[in-house]
Amino acid sequence: MKVERIEALPLTKEQTLGYARIAVREKLGKPAGNVRYMGGGSFGRAVSVQCTDGQSLVVKFLRAKDMMEKEAHDLKLLAKYSTVRVPDVLFTRRGDEKIPVDCYGMERIEGKSSLFALGMLLIGKKRRKEFADQVTTALHAIHSC
């Protein structure tokens, strides 16, 4: 088995905020109003953007080369085959001299994590089972693509 080592490109939280403004202006043709760092992991960073016209989106920056095609493809597959709502990809942008990493913008879907929601603990056993069935069905649909 061939194992490749993926090297993450350097990208600070502060840089992502400025880069999000640039990407939104270039790709959507409008100014970003409020930008807020959401979080990140080994290979990505996410920024919440509220445009001055009210549109909300998330810009995800990919710190590993050639990840954008896979991520965009996976989101499209999920949108097609999954029973859960998946954000639409609004734009993709290759890294260049202005923004050195690939990024894409996607629709922002409001919601909370059900994993730690107090309400999930308080609902009845039947409703918790129904929720678990929905999650299982969605996971099965995703892995059957």
Segment roles from a protein language model:
Residues 1-32:
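Juxta-kinase regulatory segment immediately upstream of eukaryotic protein kinase catalytic domains
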Residues 34-145:
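ATP-binding pocket architecture of kinase catalytic cores
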